[in-house]
Each structure stands twice: as structure tokens, then as C-alpha cells.
């Protein structure tokens, strides 16, 4: 019996989680109760991709990947603006990683893009693309249950080419944490020629800020907006992160900043609270 982690854009809704859990347990053998963890994604497959890569890497480095299944579902059905018959969504796929961790769910957008190079085998399970507005409750549990009970050999699946997973090009907001730090999809190697204290211009949406490049997120004084190698991404090339060490004793501002000074604004607030998936432009100041 494997355990399950769910990464989905409905995972912050208690009713949806309960309905999914009830349906899944109903498909499992009696007295089988896997641990189920939920990680909420924004309505962006780029955010889901970022979360997936981080969960996979942590599980492979510190956990037991061969004892876990990841179920992803952020299928915004953005492939068409036309009417969708029978609520049809992206096809359900199963990816077996080299670490033996299993990742499954709709192959929607960029959800699998950041773990593409870790996939050893890639399959499609046909017949559950449509028929429900909440496929995670009504259609997917029967397949997920087989994976949890290690009965994937009983599933009628066809092998797929990895070319069906798009590459993620460009730089994006990957995640915004509860401190207001912006975790990007920019590898640290992009700024490897920069020195501590160099200025870099970062544009997210219609907001451009000059930020200091530092060797770590605490490399500048409180209240200074910095960009540095963070804690996410590949171990040998971490993603860059935008951060501010907030000064709890800073004096309040006036006007729009009443009750809050610039020194106490988080990185996210400096960029008008961007959403995961928003594109990032960066260029050096010489």
C-alpha cells in the first residue's frame, strides 16, 4: 500500500477534499487506509509544476519515493474558448519516475514539465477524459486506487512519448510563500556572473523594481529587496527567490502606505502581489 499526495487547484476547498477522499476510500479494499496529504495549487499549471517538482525532489531526497503516489489536477481547460462537450478535459496519464515514485493525473498544460527529465515510463489511461465536471471525485479514484494498492498491472494503459509534455520556456513566478517571498523559475546559474551587491532589474506584470543580488536571502539589511538562490529547484542549480527581511520596528508610512512602511513590505507587495504563473522579465544594470 502506497501513500498519496494530492496537488490540485481544488485542494484548498474542504468539501472537495472530503468528496474526493470518500470516493477514493470507496474504491480501496476494506481496512486499507493510506495517508493522504493535500497541497493547494493556484489555478495555474505552472504553479502545479513548481509544487510537483518540489514535492518530488523532497520525497526523493528525504522520503520514500517508492512508497508514494502523487495525484495532480489543475486542468483549467484552457485549450479552447469554445463550448466543451461533456466537460471533457485533458487525458489522464501515469508517469513512473526513475526513483519509482508514481505521478498521475490530467496531462494539463505545464503540470509535468519540470519533472519531464525524471520520467522513466509514461502511460495514458483512456476513457475518463469526460463525463463529469468533478472528475477527481467521479472518474479518477478507481485508477488512483489501483496505483495505491500496487495493482497497476491490472490497468489497461498505453505507453506515451514524453514529447506529449511541453517544455516550460521563459521565467515565471513559481510560488509565493506565506512570508510574501516570490519563488521564481529562474535558475541561479542565470546570474552566476553577478557579484554580491550588484543591481538587477526585475519586471513582473507592469511593475519593475531594482533589486540587490546577494549570495543568500539574508545577505542585506532589513527592508532591502533582494534576489538570491532560494531553497527550491534542483540541488545543483536552485531557483532564484525575491525576498525582503521585514523590519518589525520600521516607522509607518503615509497615504497608501499608512500603517506600513516600505521597509515592512514583503517582496510580493513590492510587485503588487503577483500570482503564480505570472511571467518575469529580468535584465542586468551595468
For the regions a protein language model found, what residue spans apply to each?
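Short acidic, Gly/Ser-rich segments with clustered Asp/Glu that frequently serve as metal-coordination loops
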Residues: 10-15, 77, 179-182
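Short, basic/aromatic-enriched C-terminal tail that caps enzymatic domains
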Residues: 3, 272-286
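Alpha/propeptide regions of enzymes that mature by internal proteolysis
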Residues: 1-73, 283
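Active-site histidine-anchored catalytic micro-motif
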Residues: 3, 29, 33-35, 43, ...
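Structural motif
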Residues: 2-5, 34-37, 67-71, 91-94, ...
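Anionic-ligand-binding alpha/beta catalytic cores of soluble enzymes and soluble regulatory domains
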Residues: 115-201
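A conserved acidic, glycine/proline-rich C-terminal tail/linker
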Residues: 185-273
Amino acid at each position: 500500500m502506497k501513500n498519496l499526495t494530492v496537488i490540485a487547484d481544488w485542494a484548498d476547498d474542504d468539501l472537495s477534499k472530503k468528496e474526493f477522499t470518500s470516493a477514493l476510500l470507496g474504491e480501496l479494499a476494506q481496512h486499507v487506509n493510506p495517508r493522504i496529504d493535500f497541497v493547494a495549487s493556484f489555478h495555474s499549471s505552472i504553479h502545479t509544476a513548481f509544487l510537483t517538482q518540489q514535492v518530488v525532489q523532497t520525497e526523493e531526497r528525504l522520503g520514500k519515493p517508492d512508497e508514494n503516489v502523487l495525484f495532480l489536477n489543475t486542468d483549467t481547460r484552457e485549450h479552447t474558448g469554445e463550448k466543451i462537450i461533456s466537460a471533457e478535459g485533458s487525458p489522464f496519464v501515469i508517469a513512473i519516475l526513475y526513483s519509482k515514485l508514481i505521478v498521475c493525473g490530467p496531462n494539463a498544460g505545464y503540470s509535468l514539465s519540470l519533472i519531464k527529465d525524471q520520467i522513466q515510463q509514461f502511460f495514458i489511461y483512456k476513457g475518463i477524459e469526460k463525463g463529469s465536471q468533478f472528475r477527481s471525485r467521479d472518474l479518477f479514484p478507481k485508477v488512483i486506487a489501483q496505483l495505491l494498492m500496487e495493482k497497476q498491472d491490472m490497468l489497461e494503459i498505453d505507453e506515451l512519448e514524453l514529447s506529449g509534455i511541453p517544455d516550460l520556456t521563459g521565467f515565471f513566478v513559481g510560488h509565493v510563500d506565506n512570508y510574501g517571498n516570490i519563488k521564481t523559475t529562474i535558475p541561479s546559474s542565470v546570474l552566476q556572473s553577478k557579484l554580491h551587491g550588484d543591481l538587477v532589474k526585475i519586471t513582473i506584470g507592469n511593475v519593475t523594481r531594482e533589486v540587490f543580488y546577494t549570495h543568500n536571502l539574508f545577505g542585506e539589511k532589513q527592508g532591502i529587496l533582494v534576489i538570491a538562490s532560494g531553497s527550491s529547484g534542483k540541488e545543483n542549480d536552485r531557483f532564484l527567490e525575491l525576498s525582503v527581511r521585514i523590519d518589525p520596528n520600521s516607522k509607518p508610512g503615509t497615504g497608501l502606505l499608512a500603517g506600513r512602511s516600505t521597509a515592512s513590505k514583503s517582496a510580493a507587495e513590492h510587485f503588487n502581489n503577483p500570482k503564480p504563473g505570472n511571467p518575469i522579465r529580468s535584465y542586468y544594470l551595468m
